[in-house]
From Swiss-Prot:
Residues 8-23 have a biased composition (Low complexity). Residues 1-24 are annotated as: Disordered. This is Putative uncharacterized protein DDB_G0281631.
C-alpha cells in the first residue's frame, strides 16, 4: 500500500470519525433536551431545591449550547440543523447559515431567561442562610424586631398557615390597569414597582397606554418624592417598554407638568414632533398649555383645541400677570386658529388693541380680586377716578372679559365676574345660582307640597336627597303625614345610616312602624335595597313589620347584585342573620374584589364538589355550628336544604363560573377539576377574566391535565395572555412548557405583540418566525413603535434578534 493510499485512508477515517462525533453530538444534544424538560417540570414547585435546580437548568442549557458550538459550523449539514431546529419548535425551512443563527439565538434567550429566574431567587434574602440587616438605627427594639423577622426559620413558622402564596404573588402584579382597579393602595404598589424596576404592562384592551395615562393623571403634585418617581419612571420604562414619542404624547395628554419637566431634564431622550389634540377642562390645564407652548412648542403640532371649563374662577388665586400670559397664549395665532367653536373675531381684535398696554411689576403680581376691590361698576365713586386709572381698569376688565368669552362660554360665571362687570340693576337681574340660594330656599319651602308630593316617587326622591338630621327634623316638624306615615317603606331610600337611626327615633316617638314587602325574591344591590339598610331592618322586627303572608325561611331568596354591593362585612352579616335559606349571587366573583367573600363561602362550605352536579352548594353558618353539635346534626357533605329551621344551613345558588371563581380565590385549585360535568368553556371564560392575574401554578396544572391539548383552547389562551401583555406567563411557558408553542401559528402571536408594541414579548417570538423588515413596517400602524426602534434595522429574515 502506497503512502498516498495510506493518507487517503487516514483522511477517510478522520472524516468518518468526525461524522460519527457529529452524530453522537446531535444524539447527546437531543437526549439532553428531553432530560432537561423533565428537570424543569420536576423542579417547578420545589422551594427548598430552587437554587440548585436553577443552577442545573442553566448548566443544562449551557451544556446544550456548548455541545452545539462544538460542532464545526461548516461541517453541520442542513439535515442536522433542521433536526435540532425542529426538536425545539423552530422554523427549519432555511439555509444553513440562517438556521445556525436562529438556533444560537434560541439558546441565548433560554439561558438569559433562566439567569433571570436564578437572579430573582438569589436576590430574595430569605433564600440566604444568614440574611444581612442593612438598616442603621439607634432604636434597639426596631433592630431586634428586624433580626427576628428576617430569621428564615422563624419567618416560615409564623407564616406556615398562609396557604395562598402560590396563588397570590406580589411579583406577579404587573398590569397597571388591574392594580389601579383592584387595590386600594394602588399608588403605593405602583411606586414600589417603579422603584424596583419591575415589569409593568401599561396597556389594556385596545389602548396600549391607558396604564401610563392613569399613572400620570394621579401623580402630579410637585413634591420631591413625585419628582424622584417620575425620574425613575422615565429611566426604567421610556424606550424600554414605551417609545419616547408615545411617552411624551401621554405626558401632554395628561397635563402633567412635573413629568414634562422630568422628560426634558433627561438628556438621553430624543423625540420628533408629535401631533396633539387638546381637550382642556381646567384652568390648570390652560397653564400647562402655556408652559408647553412657551418652552417646547418646537416638539408639538397642535391639531385642535377644545375648551370646556365649567365655572372657571380666576379671581380667587390668579394674579394679573398670570391672566395676561394665558390670554397671550390663547390669542396667539398658532393657538387661536386651533380652538373650536369660535363665533367671531371680535375678541381677537380687542386683544390686539390692549396687548401693548404696560402694567407695573407690582400690578402684574397683584391678585385680581385685590386689584379690583376698590372699584366696581356699581361703585358710586367710579366716575371720579382719573382717566389714566380708569383706562387701566378698563384694560383689566377687557382681559377678564375676552378670557371668559373664550373659555367660559355660556356657563355661569363666578360671582366676582358679575360684581365687577355689571351695574346695580344688572347685578340684581342677572344673579347667578349662588346668589339665588336664599330665594330658591323660600320658593321650595312654600311650594314643597305641590312640587314634591305629587306621587310616591317624589317622596322617595325627597327622602333620598336628605343630607342631614336637620333636614329630616324639618320634614318631621312640618310634614309628618307625608313622610312619617305608619308602615311606610321610606327607610329603603335613606342614604345614610346616621339619618336612618334618627328616622327610627322619630317614628318611635309617634308610635309608628316601618314595613317591607314580604316578596319571595329580595333584591340587594344596584337595583334593589341597600344591603346595610336591609340588615338593620331584619335585625329589628319590632320596628320593621312584614307586610303580607308570613313565609318560612326556606322560601326566601336573597338576590345579591355586587355592582353596588358595599363589601364583605355586610355580605357576611346578611348571611349570618340566618334570615334567608337561599342565596343567589347575580354577579361575577371577580379576582381580588371578592377574595374575602369567596374564602368565607369556601371555609364554611359543606358540599363535596365531585358530587356537585347542580350549580348550588351548601354552607354551615359558623355562628350556628354549636346548635348542630348540641342537637347531634352532622355537618357532613352532600347535605340537603333542611326544613328551614335554625340549623344554620344555607343554600347558595351559583353558576359554574362563580363556583370556579370561589374555588380559585380560595386556593382550592384541585377541587376545580373535581367538579362533575365541568364545561371546558367555563374554564376558557374564567381564564379570560383572570388572565392578568392568573397564577403559574394554575397554568401548570392546566397543562399537566391536558387542557391545552385542544388546539382552539390553546389558541384562545395564548391569544389572551399576549393581549394582556402577560410576560411572566409567557416566560414561564417558554422555559417550562415550550411544547405549547409547537404546531401553533406563532406568527399570529407575534403580530399581536407588535400591535401592543411589546418588544419583550415580540423578541421571544421572533426566533420562532420568519419575519422581514417589510412585514414589520406593514403591521405597525403608529408613528412611534418601540419594536421598530429596537429591532427594525436588525430584521432581514427575522432571526437577527438579541444576539448577545
Amino acid at each position: 500500500m502506497g503512502d498516498d493510499e495510506s493518507d487517503n485512508n487516514n483522511n477517510n477515517n478522520n472524516n468518518n470519525n468526525n461524522n460519527n462525533n457529529n452524530n453522537i453530538g446531535c444524539k447527546i444534544l437531543k437526549t439532553v433536551i428531553s432530560g432537561r424538560r423533565s428537570i424543569l417540570l420536576e423542579s417547578y414547585n420545589n422551594n427548598n431545591k430552587n437554587k440548585n435546580n436553577n443552577n442545573i437548568i442553566i448548566k443544562s442549557y449551557e451544556d446544550e449550547f456548548n455541545l452545539f458550538k462544538l460542532n464545526n459550523k461548516k461541517e453541520l449539514s442542513i439535515e442536522k440543523l433542521q433536526t435540532i431546529a425542529k426538536d425545539n419548535g423552530l422554523p427549519f425551512d432555511e439555509n444553513e447559515n440562517d438556521l445556525y443563527n436562529r438556533i444560537e439565538i434560541y439558546y441565548n434567550i433560554k439561558i438569559k431567561l433562566e439567569k433571570e429566574v436564578k437572579q430573582q431567587h438569589d436576590n430574595n434574602p430569605f433564600n440566604k442562610g444568614h440574611p444581612i440587616l442593612l438598616i442603621n438605627n439607634d432604636n434597639k427594639n426596631e433592630i431586634l424586631f428586624w433580626k427576628v423577622f428576617r430569621n428564615k426559620l422563624i419567618f416560615k413558622n409564623i407564616f406556615s398557615n398562609f396557604k395562598y402564596s402560590n396563588l397570590f404573588n406580589y411579583s406577579r402584579l404587573f398590569s397597571v390597569y388591574n392594580i389601579y382597579n383592584d387595590f386600594n393602595n394602588c399608588i403605593e404598589i405602583i411606586r414600589d414597582k417603579v422603584k424596583s424596576n419591575s415589569y409593568l404592562a401599561f396597556g389594556h384592551c385596545l389602548d396600549n397606554f391607558s396604564g401610563l395615562s392613569t399613572i400620570l393623571k394621579n401623580i402630579k403634585k410637585d413634591t420631591q418624592e413625585n419628582q424622584l418617581f417620575h425620574n425613575r419612571l422615565l429611566n426604567n420604562y421610556c424606550n424600554k417598554l414605551i417609545h419616547a414619542g408615545n411617552f411624551f404624547k401621554i405626558i401632554i395628554e395628561s397635563f402633567n407638568l412635573l413629568a414634562l419637566k422630568s422628560f426634558f431634564n433627561n438628556k438621553t431622550l430624543k423625540i420628533k414632533k408629535v401631533k396633539i389634540n387638546f381637550e382642556i377642562n381646567k384652568i390648570s390645564e390652560l397653564k400647562f398649555l402655556e408652559y408647553l407652548f412657551n418652552n417646547h412648542k418646537e416638539y408639538i403640532e397642535i391639531q385642535k383645541i377644545i375648551i370646556t371649563i365649567l365655572k372657571p374662577n380666576i379671581f380667587e388665586k390668579f394674579k394679573l400677570g398670570e391672566l395676561i400670559k394665558l390670554v397671550m397664549i390663547l390669542y396667539d395665532d398658532e393657538i387661536y386658529t386651533k380652538i373650536e367653536k369660535l363665533d367671531n373675531l371680535k375678541n381677537k381684535l380687542i386683544y390686539n388693541k390692549i396687548k401693548e398696554f404696560q402694567f407695573s411689576d407690582k400690578e402684574l403680581n397683584e391678585n385680581l380680586l385685590t386689584l379690583l376691590k376698590p372699584v366696581t361698576k356699581s361703585d358710586r365713586f367710579y366716575i371720579k377716578l382719573n382717566d389714566n386709572y380708569n383706562n387701566k381698569l378698563n384694560i383689566i376688565f377687557k382681559y377678564i372679559n375676552i378670557f371668559y368669552k373664550l373659555v367660559g362660554g355660556s356657563t355661569i360665571k363666578p360671582f366676582e365676574y358679575y360684581f365687577t362687570h355689571m351695574g346695580e340693576k344688572e347685578l340684581i337681574e342677572n344673579k347667578p345660582n349662588e346668589i339665588n340660594q336664599r330665594q330658591t330656599k323660600m320658593v321650595i319651602n312654600s311650594n314643597i307640597k305641590r312640587i314634591l308630593l305629587k306621587n310616591n316617587n317624589d317622596t322617595h326622591e325627597t327622602i333620598n336627597s336628605i343630607k342631614s338630621i336637620d333636614m329630616l327634623d324639618s320634614l318631621f316638624n312640618n310634614y309628618q303625614d307625608q313622610f312619617f306615615k305608619d308602615r311606610n317603606e321610606n327607610w329603603k331610600y335613606v342614604n345614610s345610616i346616621t339619618i336612618l337611626k334618627h328616622y327610627e327615633k322619630l317614628m318611635l316617638s309617634l308610635g309608628r312602624k316601618f314595613s317591607f314587602n314580604n316578596s319571595n325574591v329580595i333584591e340587594i344591590g344596584s337595583k334593589g335595597i341597600q344591603s346595610k339598610l336591609y340588615l338593620i331592618a331584619i335585625n329589628n322586627p319590632s320596628l320593621y313589620q312584614v307586610i303580607g303572608e308570613k313565609k318560612k325561611k326556606k322560601d326566601y331568596v336573597l338576590n345579591l347584585n355586587f355592582i353596588a354591593f358595599p363589601g364583605k362585612l355586610t355580605f357576611i352579616s346578611l348571611i349570618e342573620s340566618n334570615y334567608f335559606k337561599n342565596i343567589k349571587i347575580s354577579e361575577s366573583l371577580e379576582f381580588t374584589k371578592y377574595i374575602t367573600i369567596s374564602r368565607w363561602i369556601s371555609d364554611n362550605c359543606i358540599s363535596i364538589f365531585s358530587d356537585n352536579n347542580k350549580p348550588e352548594i351548601y354552607i354551615q353558618l359558623p355562628n350556628l355550628k354549636k346548635i348542630n353539635i348540641v342537637s347531634g346534626i352532622s355537618s357532613g357533605s352532600g347535605i340537603s336544604s333542611g326544613s328551614g329551621g335554625n340549623d344554620g344551613k344555607i343554600k347558595i345558588i351559583l353558576d359554574q363560573l362563580q363556583l370556579v371563581q370561589i374555588l380559585y380565590n380560595s386556593n382550592r385549585i384541585d377541587d376545580i377539576f373535581k367538579i362533575k360535568n365541568l364545561d371546558s368553556n367555563i374554564i376558557t371564560s374564567f381564564i379570560k377574566n383572570i388572565s392578568p392575574h392568573i397564577s403559574l401554578d394554575f397554568v401548570n396544572r392546566l397543562i399537566i391535565r391536558g387542557y391545552f391539548n385542544n388546539y382552539q383552547k390553546k389558541n384562545n389562551f395564548l391569544n389572551q395572555i399576549v393581549l394582556n401583555n402577560n410576560l411572566p406567563i409567557i416566560k414561564f411557558l417558554y422555559l417550562n412548557h415550550s411544547s405549547c408553542f409547537f404546531y401553533y401559528n406563532l406568527k399570529d402571536l407575534l403580530l399581536l405583540a407588535i400591535s401592543n408594541d411589546n418588544y419583550q414579548i415580540a423578541e421571544l417570538f421572533f426566533v420562532f418566525c420568519n419575519f422581514t423588515r417589510k412585514e414589520l413596517k406593514s403591521v405597525i400602524k403608529t408613528k412611534f413603535s418601540l419594536i421598530e426602534l429596537i429591532h427594525g434595522n436588525k430584521l432581514k429574515l427575522g432571526i437577527e434578534i438579541i444576539k448577545k
